[in-house]
A protein has these predicted regions:
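NAD(P)-dependent short-chain dehydrogenase/reductase
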Residues: 150-206
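Conserved Rossmann-fold NAD(P)-dependent oxidoreductase catalytic core, especially the SDR/UDP-sugar
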Residues: 88, 92-136
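Glycine-rich NAD(P)-binding loop of the Rossmann-fold in SDR/ketoreductase-type enzymes
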Residues: 81-92, 138-139, 209
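Alpha-helical substrate-binding/gating segment
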Residues: 185-237
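NAD(P)H-binding glycine-rich loop region in Rossmannoid oxidoreductase-like domains
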Residues: 38, 48-88, 96, 116
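Mid/C-terminal beta-alpha module of Rossmann-like enzyme folds, strongest
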Residues: 215-274, 290, 310-313, 319, ...
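Active-site Tyr-X1-5-Lys
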Residues: 133-160
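N-terminal Rossmann NAD(P)H-binding glycine-rich loop of SDR-like oxidoreductase domains
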Residues: 1-22
Length: 345
């Protein structure tokens, strides 16, 4: 099999490359990214391509499967650029897959696609309108609607959608810091056992999953015969109290309105890059039931949610990074100069 991975150099993309390379059925991998990395991966060659403007068809011709991962989270202050890359760029990918005759497409959706609901497990049939106030959720929901139309127009193509929870690994620590915490995070203090407290925001319950496990899910989807949507998450779900217990920190209750006001103020002041609607997302989305992934993909996580968070925090404290542009070590002065959340990561 020849597989093209679009958005191959980030947190998820690098894990997907590693998982694909372990499979005998995969003979070659083409990794597409805005910036070609100096790092090398088995069976993989890289090419530069921007989903928002470049011709993707030549890269996709002859592929047995395309995995579309490319997505921008920053700059959070430029919603037009985010829409152009995430929604219009995904639409261009789907069109290129059709024109190039690629028989299978695996798309990186998200827990964020789901409509608000109670904090209970839902399967893949839950409504997909996203949290109304979250730009991320609205982009994910719109792309899935466009993918619906792609499937209707191309019933001969095998389409898979993975809807994972929050994805983490140590090598992506500096990337996660730039995306969500910014240049003023006192990284050495977030090591498990050193962090004095974490906020417990009633109603904010999240799921996480290790990037390597997500990479395995994509490899299973790409090389198998499965179709349709699959939730992907690890156990257990985490609130502030459970998170605090996992990392040896005291959980301090912070009401959701106060937490949102603090997030909004610090974002407006450019002290951190995460807009307050991310808290709306954490409060609004339901929890994922990943039974279908286990039964039809043969997938299961190999790491617990607590272990994954501990690994990320240890990586944050150490400044862990990797040799691709999205995962590189941080340029905190450059982040400040760009306005904290003012440029792509």
């Amino acid at each position: 099999m020849r597989i093209v991975v679009i958005g191959a150099t980030g947190n998820v993309g690098t894990s997907v490359l590693e998982a694909l390379a372990r499979r005998d059925a995969v003979t070659s991998i083409l990794g597409l990214a805005r910036r070609v990395p100096s790092a090398s991966y088995p069976k993989t060659t890289f090419a530069a391509a921007d989903v928002s403007r470049d011709d993707l068809v030549p890269h996709l011709r002859g592929a047995d499967c395309a995995i579309h991962l490319a997505w921008l989270i920053q700059p959070s202050r430029d919603r037009e650029l985010l829409w152009r890359t995430n929604v219009l760029g995904s639409t261009r990918v789907f069109g290129a897959v059709a024109e190039a005759g690629v028989p299978a497409l695996v798309y990186a959706s998200s827990i964020g696609v789901y409509s608000p609901g109670p904090k209970q497990r839902v399967d893949e049939s839950w409504p997909r309108e996203g949290v109304p106030s979250s730009w991320y959720a609205q982009h994910k929901a719109e792309v899935e609607r466009r993918l619906d139309r792609f499937e209707e127009g191309h019933p001969d193509r095998r389409v898979v959608r993975l809807r994972p929870a929050l994805i983490m690994k140590a090598d992506a620590a500096e990337s996660v810091r730039r995306l969500f915490f910014g240049p003023f995070l006192p990284s050495p203090l977030v090591r498990p056992g050193r962090l004095p407290f974490v906020p417990h925001i009633p109603g904010a319950i999240v799921q996480v999953v290790h990037s390597h496990d997500v990479g395995e899910a994509y490899a299973l989807a790409a090389t198998g015969e499965a179709r349709g949507p699959f939730n992907v998450a690890a156990e257990p779900e985490l609130d502030g109290r459970r998170l605090g217990a996992a990392i040896g920190a005291r959980a301090v209750t912070v009401p959701a309105p106060l937490a949102r006001a603090l997030a909004a103020a610090t974002w407006r002041l450019r002290l951190q890059p995460t807009s307050p609607d991310w808290l709306d997302l954490a409060l609004g989305v339901p929890l994922l039931d990943w039974t279908r992934a286990r039964e039809e993909l043969g997938w299961a996580p190999t790491r617990t949610a607590e272990d994954t968070v501990r690994e990320l925090l240890t990586g944050l404290a150490a400044g862990a990074s990797s040799d691709t542009p999205p995962l590189r070590g941080g340029d905190r002065a450059g982040e400040i100069k760009a306005g904290v959340g003012g440029r792509p990561v």
